[in-house]
């Protein structure tokens, strides 16, 4: 057999941007306990430390323990005020939650003012993308193992009280997520 020489080939460079696809996105300030919550809800093993921006890349976990369905949860790095304008690598972080179906707003009840935290976080989401404020939202008040968090919880009934560190309230949160995703599937 004899092969004939082919024609010169083409060469091109492409830059692809990967955006995570997950069912649920955990959104909150640095040190709100998002990575600890991901670990409590799934079998994921993200890096956890008590300094801001421990999480620099999104972490994924699959929640399925004893649930009628399984779903993927994305823990994105902490959002700070000005994130939608690129402050603190905010745009790099926010783009990952655009493709989630449901947002879980994680607020540190031990240290933050829940109303102000929610205002800032939802404002950053709205400034980044028109589609993000339209997504279903579950509010979580984290760090309920601390006395100062419990004091605030009674005044803020719209939040599911959770302690990611002790797993208190995680079953209620998983049930709320499952119910919301189920309603969305039926719609």
Tell me what each language-model feature is.
Residues 21, 62, 77-80, 108-114, ...:
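Conserved nucleotide-binding/hydrolysis micro-motifs of P-loop NTPases
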Residues 99-120, 131-133, 144-149:
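Conserved Switch II/interswitch segment of TRAFAC-class P-loop GTPases
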């Amino acid at each position: 057999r004899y092969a004939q020489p082919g024609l010169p080939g083409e060469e091109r460079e492409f830059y692809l941007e990967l955006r995570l696809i997950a069912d649920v996105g955990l959104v909150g300030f640095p040190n709100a306990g998002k990575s600890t919550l991901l670990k409590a809800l799934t079998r994921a093993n993200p890096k956890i430390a008590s300094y801001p921006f421990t999480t620099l890349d999104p972490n994924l976990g699959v929640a399925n323990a004893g649930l009628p369905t399984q779903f993927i949860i994305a823990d994105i790095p902490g959002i700070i005020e000005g994130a939608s304008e690129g402050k603190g690598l905010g745009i790099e972080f926010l783009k990952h939650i655009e493709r989630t179906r449901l947002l879980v707003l994680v607020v540190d009840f031990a240290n933050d003012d829940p109303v102000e935290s929610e205002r800032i976080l939802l404002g950053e989401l709205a400034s980044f993308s028109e589609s993000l404020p339209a997504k279903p939202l579950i509010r979580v008040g984290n760090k309920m193992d601390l006395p100062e968090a419990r004091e605030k919880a009674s005044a803020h009934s719209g939040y599911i009280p959770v302690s990611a560190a002790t797993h208190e309230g995680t079953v209620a949160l998983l049930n709320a997520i499952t119910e919301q995703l189920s309603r969305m599937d039926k719609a």
